[in-house]
Amino acid sequence: FTAAATYKMTKQFGFTADFTYNTQRPNMSNFAPAEMPNVDKITIPLGRAGIYFNNDWISLTSLFSYIAKTNNNSTLNLINPNNDKDIKAAALSYDIETIGWTTDAVVKPFKGFDFHFLFTYQSPKYKKYETGVTFSDGTTSGINATGNIVTEIPKVLIELDPSYNITKDLKVWASFRYFSKTYANIKNAYYFNGRWETFGGINWNVNKHLSLSGTVINFLNQTGAKGSISGAELVDKENAAAYNGAWMAGSYIRPFTVEFAAKITF
């Protein structure tokens, strides 16, 4: 279900809103664990409302938004606090929701030059993220991450995308993307500092049959980890310091890379 409305105050300025409501059922991969997943309907409501402004040199929208997703299925391996070799799987079904604010603008101050700007603030949180198990010796173990920030999702996103058409067939461009602090595990005990990811390049349409391009990835040569830390999902803040200096597996920022490409059209 989708609905949208726009109200024009003037030829250039107005208000806009839209709402989308999607539903689905769990997919086949949710049945892979031994535990039966929650087969309740998954709902994804998305609502946005804000303003827009357009003229010859700028196109701008600024929107407040709300989005949620219910009945996400997951399985956690909980460890017996009295025996770290005693591990039991626990199924859970949880929700995610966030409110946010996004401003998107395309500026064309002079012929051939475009500048795209995007700013997003969001605060995605877990809801009903609770589960637990009882081990054979009677010991219980559980997790409650309700209210925690969703892993790997930054609160602040910024995109800066300038481009310039030297001729109608030759274009240079760059892209700067900022991701604020992201949490690396469910209990928000570990986090990665904010980072920039940078790209740049040149595109040349030689003729109707041949296009050439060159791209530089991470031209500021940023380094570091990102994403999540495998095996650290259930470490809490009180015990996080115990892992200082320990080797952990995760993912990393893509290193400095230069790429060339050619496209031939017959």
Please tell me what each predicted stretch does.
Residues K181-T182, W204-F266:
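C-terminal beta-signal and adjacent terminal beta-strands/loops
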Residues A5-Q24, W57-S59, L63-N73, L78-N185, ...:
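Gram-negative outer-membrane beta-barrel transporters
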Residues N30, V39, T75, A225-G231:
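A surface-exposed, glycine/aromatic-enriched loop/edge motif typical of exported proteins
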Residues F31-A34, N82-D84, L234-A242:
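Short glycine/proline- and charge-enriched loop/turn segments
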Residues Q24-S29, P33-P37:
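Flexible loop and strand-edge segments within Gram-negative outer membrane beta-barrel domains
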Residues G200-I202:
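Short, basic/aromatic-rich helical patch in the C-terminal catalytic core of site-specific tyrosine
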Residues E35-D40, A90-S93, A145-V150, K187-Y191, ...:
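Outer-membrane beta-barrel domain signature
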Residues F1, T43-G47, Y52-D56, Y66, ...:
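Residues that define the transmembrane beta-barrel architecture of outer-membrane proteins
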